[in-house]
Amino acid sequence: MKQYLELMQKVLDEGTQKNDRTGTGTLSIFGHQMRFNLQEGFPLVTTKRCHLRSIIHELLWFLQGNTNIAYLHENNVTIWDEWADENGDLGPVYGKQWRAWPTPDGRHIDQITTVLNQLKNDPDSRRIIVSAWNVGELDKMALAPCHAFFQFYVADGKLSCQLYQRSCDVFLGLPFNIASYALLVHMMAQQCDLEVGDFVWTGGDTHLYSNHMDQTHLQLSREPRPLPKLIIKRKPESIFDYRFEDFEIEGYDPHPGIKAPVAI
């Protein structure tokens, strides 16, 4: 995960001080790209411990089309608590847009099923895309999508994915985002009988919050360790049938976790 540490250092060296929606303040750069060859290991940050349970359950929750935090709470995941209303609802966030994007004529488009069908039947298409950025529903969402748009690409029997993330909390959020989409690529590849290729991450407003500086310097002082390996124990009938128990991370030996406040 050298690329991730290099990004942190770049934001420290080149970032512009900016105000933000949360009132916390950031150092920010605009436009950055990282590429992870998923054949070389699972891109889970090793310079601090990442909470893999939260990453897996959040992705399964997205794939369910769920937008209420009850499922997350049932599995001891609290990463969405700050944005939920008193009933646990978040409005039409990621899961809704991925699985039931509303059309003007009253239909709903299941984008995940659509891209799976494209990967199986038209893998050379340049339109294998999922968008969470539904302009017509942004004002109903508890939080506008940060990781907003992703595209799949098949070449030489390998599945790659590029994500555009319009806003990126480099210290807290980005390790989750990288691991989550890498996991999704592995799942999609298994469902389509493909090998994994690259995960390409592209960031817009890429920032470190002002109250994450000490934590960032601590993380940069640590030496990265070898990447772990992802093992998927079974192949379900559908992308929507995976369970938490289907995934195992082998050889994950991270440095200790680093606590930091969430900007809300």
From Swiss-Prot:
Membership in a protein family: Belongs to the thymidylate synthase family. Bacterial-type ThyA subfamily.
Domain of life assignment: Bacteria
Binding site for (6R)-5,10-methylene-5,6,7,8-tetrahydrofolate: 51, 169, 263
Subunit structure: Homodimer.
Pathway stated in the Swiss-Prot or TrEMBL entry: Pyrimidine metabolism; dTTP biosynthesis
Record's keyword annotation contains Transferase: yes
Name of the top EC class for this enzyme: transferase
Record GO terms (molecular function): thymidylate synthase activity
Protein name listed in UniProt: Thymidylate synthase
Keyword tRNA processing: no
Function: Catalyzes the reductive methylation of 2'-deoxyuridine-5'-monophosphate (dUMP) to 2'-deoxythymidine-5'-monophosphate (dTMP) while utilizing 5,10-methylenetetrahydrofolate (mTHF) as the methyl donor and reductant in the reaction, yielding dihydrofolate (DHF) as a by-product. This enzymatic reaction provides an intracellular de novo source of dTMP, an essential precursor for DNA biosynthesis.
Record-linked Pfam families: Thymidylat_synt (PF00303)
UniProt-listed InterPro entries: Thymidate_synth/dCMP_Mease, Thymidate_synth/dCMP_Mease_dom, Thymidate_synth/dCMP_Mease_sf, Thymidylate_synthase, Thymidylate_synthase_AS
EC code: 2.1.1.45
Gene3D superfamilies the UniProt entry points to: Thymidylate synthase/dCMP hydroxymethylase domain
Amino-acid positions noted as binding dUMP in the UniProt annotation, renumbered to this chain: 21, 126-127, 166-169, 177, 207-209
Native species: Shigella dysenteriae serotype 1 (strain Sd197)
Catalytic activity of the protein: dUMP + (6R)-5,10-methylene-5,6,7,8-tetrahydrofolate = 7,8-dihydrofolate + dTMP
Coiled coil: none
Localization terms from the record: Cytoplasm
BP-aspect Gene Ontology terms: dTMP biosynthetic process; dTTP biosynthetic process; methylation
Active site: 146 (nucleophile)
Keywords, ordered alphabetically: Cytoplasm, Methyltransferase, Nucleotide biosynthesis, Transferase
GO cellular component: cytosol
Disulfide bond sites: none
